[in-house]
Swiss-Prot record:
GO terms for biological process: cellular response to ethanol; positive regulation of transcription by RNA polymerase II. InterPro entries: Carb_Metab_Trans_Reg, Maltose_ferment_reg_DNA-bd, Zn2-C6_fun-type_DNA-bd_sf, Zn2Cys6_DnaBD. The lineage of its organism: Eukaryota, Fungi, Dikarya, Ascomycota, Saccharomycotina. One of its GO terms (cellular component) is nucleus. This is Respiratory transcription factor ZNF1. It comes from Saccharomyces cerevisiae (strain ATCC 204508 / S288c) (Baker's yeast).
């Protein structure tokens, strides 16, 4: 006798086990009429839709496959990030243009080092732009997700066996990610990994680079100077001496018609960070005088970093970083003169000494009036740190000099502090030190609400520019 596909009507209502015969055993025992009139219930999986399949694929990016390997980030998702990087970030930290990156994506996607570089570049792009992207299946990806994916798979791209340009760039990109995520200690450690690898590869020596084709030379020079800038920024706040110096030539200017691919801004940033020299940053890192940090070298900083070259497009992505870095380094030079005992510099006479931070503050405020606020975030926490350093110098003027200087400095401090506290701060440590210093000087800051760190962390160092 054929069995029915579901329980009879009586057994279903009574919620008892049915043998699905007609009549069933339970109905016979209780003298019930056994019927099968109810419509069959739909059971089993729902129909598979194309959209559901795509969503499953995207979710599995961060899951292990049945064979034990790790699923790859889809090409289409990486491609979206590469386009964003080319449009908005290449001018700030140039590695490869979109055409070159797309060629890597299409031809070398299956090569381990190349693949992880592309994923880390995607993570850094989303982190710097503070945005997220959505796949075709509706799954959202962020810089935090992609960078965590890279870090959990570190053994995939770094086997501690030699060095190549893709490993170096991967660590550089990850260092940018963690700078934006308020994790500056990890960011600094990752930058140190990149610096170590670039030395192992010999990219700090002209003899090594000259043996390479021009395109590879150019890429090596870009990466080297990106790390040099990063290391010199960190030296001020980690108090660690630098290891990279201008032992190789910067990348050569490139003839391009697209301003997004111009190296002008990057080459100017290199100039801004190399005019002071390695000795300048080492003196700041060690809080002590360096015999090579002389009066002439400090004069050079003041003279050569006074203005931005005319060829840099005003109030562009590149201009913002150059402008704030100039003001920041000139302020650090002023502080270094006060720090080095016995150094008396003619152009920093007592009468003019008090005016220097005020002049720097005035220049910075003039820039902020014309720069769209959305341009600050892409440079990371470095902009807010550099502005805070200038405000800190004004507090020193208020503390140490005559009443006229104090009044002028206070007026600028009022405006600068409003600007500083309008920016995103990834770490509250430097801000806490600044506000404490102001309270000691009996200065009331123009704050409508108390400033809070974005993550509540209490690290001793801030993050990358």
């Amino acid at each position: 006798m054929a069995r029915n596909r579901q329980a009879c009507d009586c057994c279903c209502i009574r919620r008892v086990k049915c043998d699905r015969k007609k009549p069933c055993k339970c109905c016979l025992q209780h003298n019930l009429q056994c019927t099968y009139l109810r419509p069959l219930k739909k059971r089993g999986p729902k129909p598979v839709k194309v959209r559901n399949l795509k969503k499953v694929d995207d979710v599995q990016v961060f899951s292990k496959s049945s064979s034990g390997g790790i699923m790859k980030v889809p090409k289409a998702l990486i491609d979206q990030c590469l386009r964003l990087y080319n449009d908005k970030l290449y001018v700030i930290w140039p590695l490869l243009c979109y055409d070159d990156l797309y060629e890597l994506l299409e031809k070398r996607y299956d090569e381990t080092c190349v693949y992880w570089f592309l994923v880390s570049l995607s993570a850094a792009t989303l982190s710097d732009l503070q945005t997220e992207i959505e796949s075709e299946g509706g799954v959202t990806f962020t810089g935090i997700q992609l960078s965590s994916f890279c870090m959990s798979s570190r053994q995939e791209f770094d086997d501690f066996n030699g060095s190549d340009i893709f490993k170096i760039m991967t660590y550089y990109c990850l260092n940018r990610c963690y700078a934006q995520m308020s994790n500056s200690r990890t960011s600094y450690r990752l930058s140190c990994e990149a610096v170590g690898l670039i030395k192992l590869a010999g990219f700090h020596r002209e003899e090594t680079l000259k043996l390479l084709p021009f395109d590879e030379q150019q890429l090596g020079r870009k990466v080297y100077y990106l790390l040099l800038l990063t290391e010199r920024y960190f030296s001020v706040y980690t108090h660690c001496a630098t290891s990279l110096d201008t032992t190789i030539a910067p990348p050569q200017p490139e003839n391009v018609t697209d301003p997004r691919l111009s190296l002008d801004s990057f080459l100017e940033m290199i100039r801004v960070f190399t005019v002071p020299g390695k000795c300048f940053f080492d003196a700041l890192a060690t809080d002590s005088a360096n015999v090579t940090c002389t009066e002439d070298s400090l004069k050079k900083i003041w003279r050569e970093l006074h203005t931005v070259p005319l060829e840099i497009e005003p109030w562009s992505y590149g201009y913002v970083d150059i402008s704030f870095s100039r003001h920041w380094i000139r302020t650090l030079a002023w502080k270094l003169v006060l720090q080095i005992s016995g150094m008396r510099i003619s152009f920093l006479s007592n009468s003019k000494n008090t005016h220097i931070p005020v002049e720097i503050a005035r220049d910075m405020l003039e820039d902020t009036f014309l720069i769209p606020k959305n341009l600050y975030a892409v440079h990371g926490p470095g902009i807010s740190v550099k502005a805070l350093e200038i405000a800190d110098a004004l507090v020193d003027v208020v503390n140490q000099y005559d009443q006229n200087a104090e009044s002028e400095a206070w007026n600028f401090l009022f405006d600068i502090s409003k600007f500083v506290f309008s920016l995103k701060h990834c770490d509250s440590t430097l801000v806490d030190k600044f506000t404490t210093k102001c309270q000691c000087a009996l200065i009331t800051l123009p704050l409508s609400n108390p400033l809070e760190s974005t993550d509540g962390s209490k690290e001793d160092v801030d993050a990358l520019p």
